[in-house]
Regions:
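Bulky hydrophobic segments
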Residues: 1-159, 178-198
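Individual transmembrane alpha-helices with interfacial aromatic-anchor signatures
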Residues: 160-172
Length: 198
């Protein structure tokens, strides 16, 4: 029986259908202003898209093990596609040169997490220092990698690569986003705190 997956676009669409009305309802319930509502909506859409990109396409029953040829070049299970040595993957890529595909993935990982460095301090005062937002970035990135490994174990095959270098790159992306936040904070409303709607 052939493998089936939940496609990325379908997962994102389903997530948006559930999330957007929920955010709007919560905003109406809390009587927040239009600015905070806009920021919350943007953050919710970003999270749905990010989760969709990180975890889909996802195998759904009935599935089959990946064909052997798809495992070529990787360490065999049960030591799956996991790298716990910092800068190993980055170092190999730099030594042998980045091709277009690798460069696109690298830049994509940075840009994918950059909005997190904007939204966290914008929505929550506790994340408005570089140390705090960096700590959050490390925690979130580690959680993503650990979840990918756990799902691979449950599925019986590694459907995602888990790499400590992804954590490093993601943190760089959040730091970039935080720098952008510091710049745009000069022109945006001072604090999108919850205020009763007028």
């Amino acid at each position: 029986m052939s493998a089936q997956t939940l496609p990325t676009d379908t997962a994102i669409l389903l997530g948006l259908v559930v999330t957007i009305p929920l955010v709007l309802w919560l905003g109406w319930r809390d009587r927040i202003g239009w600015w905070l509502m806009l920021v919350r909506l943007a953050f919710a859409v970003y999270l749905v898209v990010l989760i969709g990109l990180l975890f889909t396409p996802f195998p759904i029953p009935p599935w089959t093990r990946l064909p052997e040829e798809s495992l070529m070049g990787y360490r065999p299970w049960p030591y799956p596609w996991v790298n716990i040595v910092p800068f190993e993957t980055i170092g190999v890529a730099l030594r042998f040169g980045l091709d277009w595909q690798e460069g696109r993935v690298l830049v994509g990982n940075v840009l994918a997490f950059a909005p997190l460095g904007i939204f966290l301090p914008l929505l929550w005062p506790r994340w408005r220092s570089l140390v705090a937002v960096t700590g959050a970035a490390v925690g979130i990135s580690l959680a993503v990698e650990i979840t990918q490994v756990a799902l691979s174990v449950l599925l019986g095959f590694p459907y995602r690569v888990a790499d400590i270098d992804d954590v490093i790159i993601n943190v760089l992306g959040v730091a970039l986003g935080y720098a952008i936040y510091r710049a745009i904070a000069l022109v945006l409303p001072p604090d999108p705190a919850v205020q009763p709607a007028s």
